[in-house]
A protein has these predicted regions:
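Conserved alpha/beta cores of soluble small-molecule-handling proteins
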Residues: 1-118
Length: 118
């Protein structure tokens, strides 16, 4: 699997080495995160087909709601971010893993007003 050069993080496309989280990020200590695993397939005509991308993005948001996390992006924005990430990395096929998590801020079981990062 090739290394990705770019990662979409909190609404911005970043060089992968700049996409970092603080060591006291709530999700690292309490598992306060949700994710999806999405497969993109290369097509014979040179394009990509991403399997049920919109459904995956909606499910990510619904999973976050179950955990009382408010994802700061719409499903449509997440769909665009996944496609943009594949294009930025020049990947006609691959595995996309959107992740939303409670970021750095208050520690303890209840994260209070910590940001939800995606």
């Amino acid at each position: 699997m090739p290394n990705t050069k770019f990662i979409w993080f909190d609404g911005k496309m970043l060089p992968s080495e700049q996409a970092q989280v603080h060591v006291l990020t709530h999700a690292l200590h309490y598992g306060s995160a949700v994710f999806e695993g999405i497969r993109a397939y290369a097509c014979a005509d040179g394009t990509s087909a991403v399997f049920r991308l919109e459904d995956h993005c909606k499910r990510l948001i619904n999973s976050a709601k179950i955990m009382r996390l408010e994802v700061p992006f719409t499903a449509e924005q997440l769909v665009a971010a996944c496609i943009e990430t594949l294009k930025a990395n020049k990947l006609p096929e691959g595995y996309v893993r959107p992740l939303s998590f409670v970021g750095h801020g208050e520690m303890g079981v209840y994260p209070g007003n910590n940001p939800v990062q995606t």
